[in-house]
Amino acid sequence: MRNGKWFLLIFTLILASCSSSSEGLRVYPKAVGASDEGFTIQSLRTIATAEMQLRATHGSYGDFDALTQAGFLDTRFVGQTPNLKGYRYSIKASDSDFVVNADPQTTETQPTTGVRHFYLDSSDSVIHVNSTRSASKDDPVL
């Protein structure tokens, strides 16, 4: 009978630890989402710096391919709309200005964890944010 009591005690402790740890698992997606949004914000700042460098050296702003070919961004940004950490980036660039958007996207290999949409342009390099739709200059500053 003693072994039965020990077994019951150990089983109860294991069950209690499993149920308490499942509460912590709910926080994990939020932490990952915050991390992915932080990565996206830093990426937008890096893109703005790369655009300034491209304009200074080549006389105009450029798209992701121009920025990567010039060596100002790494190859993760190759293509018209690269997808990094659950965000799809897009650039509209001309000789005199550029606009960058980063919007949450889901792919087979990268599920969306961030929820906010981000915008940055060449006029002031300030990041604007919108929680429901693609951000624009009219949205609040981050």
Language-model features, listed with the residues they occupy:
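Short, low-complexity, Pro/Ser/Thr/Gly-rich segments in the mature regions of secreted, periplasmic
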Residues: 131-142
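Bacterial signal peptide processing site
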Residues: 19-22
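C-terminal motif of bacterial Sec signal peptides marking the signal peptidase cleavage site
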Residues: 14-17
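Bacterial N-terminal signal peptides that target proteins for export
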Residues: 1-7
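Membrane-proximal amphipathic alpha-helices
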Residues: 33-44
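Short secondary-structure subsegments characteristic of cysteine-rich extracellular domains
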Residues: 12, 123-127
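Extracellular/periplasmic head regions of type IV pilus-like filament subunits
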Residues: 26-30, 49-114, 122-123, 140-142
